[in-house]
Regions:
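Conserved AMP-binding/adenylation subdomain of ANL enzymes
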Residues: 1-35, 120
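Gly/Ser/Thr-rich phosphate-binding loop
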Residues: 10, 33-38, 47-112, 124
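Adenylate-forming AMP-binding core of the ANL superfamily, especially NRPS adenylation
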Residues: 68, 102-104, 110-156
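Conserved ATP-binding/catalytic segment of the ANL
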Residues: 138, 142-205, 221
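Short, conserved charged micro-motifs
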Residues: 235-242
């Protein structure tokens, strides 16, 4: 982010103030910031602070990467940018790809709300199965990116640095997803976030996304149970409605789902859900 902007002749505003501090927004206003790059945590916080109350009218471009932003927040931000004439770009990337791989153009949002867009010029996505066989359009599998921006390899020693180009422009992302007929990519989760209940493979990220239609939550597996850690109040009627939706979509019995109320969803230093900490909280709760 820093390098690309400096190469384009842009100036950067750097502050140690937090997003919830008045000083942060004073700096945005005083320095006449025109581009705001953020991760999901930033945009969720801005929505909770109420976008209309923040000094954002000078910002022409909002960009979002660093993980999946729930649909409700994307809708709010897109709606806000339409009233101000600014633009909101959803992006997808990894550090190993320097780091951007796709962008969803604002004018395509209404047609592809769950997508992270098409590959950047010069790049290409394919979807592979566990045997590295290319899958057809619409099939879910591992996302593989081909492009000139893919790194040479990981360097932990002088020998690694001397190894040359080990990846040869091909990055197996470890993410799962699918492509449509126009090349728009939808990310459904991480390979590492695949659970198995009674022999049935479950994409925990996909399940979490479905649950987020009802409440703010995170999902982990512990033994043969799916635990839902939630923040919002959850009455019995809402619980039944949620369970009815997810059991039908994922073909799981109601008995595998357990609920636990959390004071906050733990996050990593990069403001992503810390699932290891969530799992520990649930283990502690289960032992009580």
């Amino acid at each position: 982010m820093v390098t690309s902007h400096l190469l384009c002749g842009a100036a950067l505003t750097v502050t140690s103030d937090k997003l919830v501090d008045k000083k942060f927004w004073s700096a945005v206003e005083e320095m006449e910031v025109t581009h705001f790059p953020g991760v999901p945590y930033h945009y969720e916080t801005m929505c909770r602070l109420r976008l209309e109350r923040l000094p954002l009218t000078g910002i022409k471009t909002f960009t979002q990467a660093g993980g999946r932003l729930p649909e409700t927040f994307k809708e709010r931000i897109t709606g806000y940018t339409k009233t101000t004439g600014s633009k909101f770009y959803v992006m997808y990337g990894q550090t190993e790809a320097s780091p951007r791989m796709s962008t969803l153009q604002p004018e395509m949002y209404e047609l592809h709300k769950e997508s992270v867009g098409q590959a950047l010029p010069g790049g290409e996505f394919i979807i592979e199965d566990d045997q590295k066989k290319v899958l057809p359009v619409g099939s879910k599998g591992q996302i593989v990116f081909h492009g000139p921006n893919v790194m040479l390899g990981y360097g932990a020693s002088k020998e690694d640095l001397a190894a040359g180009d080990e990846l040869r422009g091909v990055l197996r992302t470890g993410d799962t997803g699918f492509l449509d007929e126009d090349g728009f990519l939808t990310v459904t989760g991480r390979d590492a976030r695949m659970g198995k209940i009674y022999g049935w493979r479950i994409n925990l990220d996909e399940l979490e996304r479905e649950i987020e239609e009802y409440l703010s939550a995170c999902v982990v597996q512990l033994d043969n149970n799916i635990w839902i850690g939630y923040l919002d109040s959850l009455d019995e009627e809402s619980r039944k409605e949620l369970l009815n939706a997810v059991t039908q979509k994922f073909s799981l019995p109601v008995s595998v789902f357990k609920f636990v109320e959390l004071n906050a969803i733990p996050t990593t230093s990069r403001n992503k859900t810390d699932y290891n900490s969530v799992l520990q909280l649930i283990k502690d709760q289960a032992q009580k």
